[in-house]
């Protein structure tokens, strides 16, 4: 019976993981309509410049683009710096 429980519980976990991934994809597509196509490249380049000086995880960099009206665009950049600054020069 334990073997059966193992396989059944795994399906529930797999379903939850798939559901979360699908929600992320849907949210990205909704948000992606207003983003310029160069934003992923810009984020990658900004991360590369920051990594020249401080070693950070890519998850510590958040870039958000917001359109306010027809002629105003806001690019918000949040970088979480590590507590111990590891200089990589």
From Swiss-Prot:
Record flagged with keyword Ligase: no
Flavoprotein listed as a keyword: no
InterPro entries named in the record: MinE (IPR005527), MinE_sf (IPR036707)
A Gene Ontology biological process term: regulation of division septum assembly
Keywords for the protein's UniProt record, in alphabetical order: Cell cycle, Cell division
Membrane-spanning segments: none
Family: Belongs to the MinE family.
Reported function: Prevents the cell division inhibition by proteins MinC and MinD at internal division sites while permitting inhibition at polar sites. This ensures cell division at the proper site by restricting the formation of a division septum at the midpoint of the long axis of the cell.
HAMAP family: MinE (MF_00262)
Protein known as: Cell division topological specificity factor
Origin species: Serratia proteamaculans (strain 568)
Gene: minE
